[in-house]
Amino acid sequence: MRGIRTNGWAKLAGFSLLAFCAVLLGAGLFRALRGAPAETAPKFKFDPDWPKPLPNKWKIGGITGLAVDKDDNVWALDRPNDLTDIELEAELNPPIADCCKRPPAMIHFDKEGNVIGSFDPPQGHGMAVDSKGFAYIGNVDHGIGNVRKYDEKTGKLIAELPHTPEMPPGGGGGDGGALTSDHVAGHGGAGPVAGFIRPVVGGVQRAQPSPEAQVARQAAIKAFREKYPPTTPMIVGGIEEVRLDEPAHELYAADNYLGGRVMVFDLDTFAFKRGWGAYGHKLSEISTDDKDREYTPNGPMPKEFRGHLTLNVSHDGLVYAADRMANRIHVFTRDGKFLKEFKMAEWTAVGGSTGGVMFSPDKEQRLLYISDLTNNHIWFLNREDGKILGQMGQMGENGGQFFGLHMEAVDSKGIIYTGEVFAGQRVQRFLPVK
């Protein structure tokens, strides 16, 4: 009898335990044992009410920089020289149309989309804003590539990074431009896509440099690289991106020299601290042979960065460098130690797929948001392993579509702001959908 009673109590206890576990499972407390739910891409909806119409008959140019400040207001760096004569007819005296006029290169929007400030630096590429009210702009001014620090409110130039007195032959000057005060009223440029027309269209070969001119150019490039080797501790090529790591008092610049160099400077003194290339190559190890930068879509990855390098720094101190022309992202420590390589949309040719790098707004920054200039998507990647979770957007000129998706920024609430070049030439906003 004693044994039977003991067995009965054991069965009762077993049933109770099973029931208790069922309750726990129903409450979701055993999810960790069953495995966490699969990460999914976030959803967003286009906000047609942001921004408000621009004042002063301005028409914005292509967006080459985008940043959100500590108050979740938005700074947009645009390229007024993208505008053509037909877009500047209100500047003529007398005007021959109701619109439009050249805008300043830097425009400040509040959360409601109103313009609350502006100033007019030489147009550039890449920007960041700090918590003290300063803007850092990568630009090309009179053939010199650099990063300049400005007072956001007054537009006063405060300081600039050390840079060479000249740029590589034929490289990096496309984002330069005069101030509005130097602009001839009513006279625009060739348009935002003129420099991107491929040499062969419809089987017709467009004009190419003569063999003699090509030989002379290669000789000039070789001489320049001997004068300014990869170890040059200053900005040499055009700037593609600027990022700040304020806790570490450091500024990161993506220098497009030799396909791309990650260059780190002291945020307070602008003194050079360190730099590296693809796969964590020391500056002294970066190749000057262009064959080491060659890339064919779906082919092997080049030994060095291919070009149009952008970057960002996560809260946990990892540096994500997007090599757009090679459809890949490299992950480093702050000291340049190579950790991982993520490949994305490797079939993409022309302008490449891996553009700007942003992070999801959660504390862990679990996701990467990658802007894609060529395919006109924002890709959502798992930050840990680079797995593509989804995408947003398609090519088009309607609201919520993209034509030349170039820049992105994310505010503290997870709202995505985008900026376009080419025929897009606008900023848009996308609200998270829960």
Segments predicted by a language model, with ranges:
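N-terminal secretory signal peptides that target proteins for export/translocation
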Residues: 1-9
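Eukaryotic scaffold repeat domains enriched in small/polar residues
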Residues: 8-17, 24-434
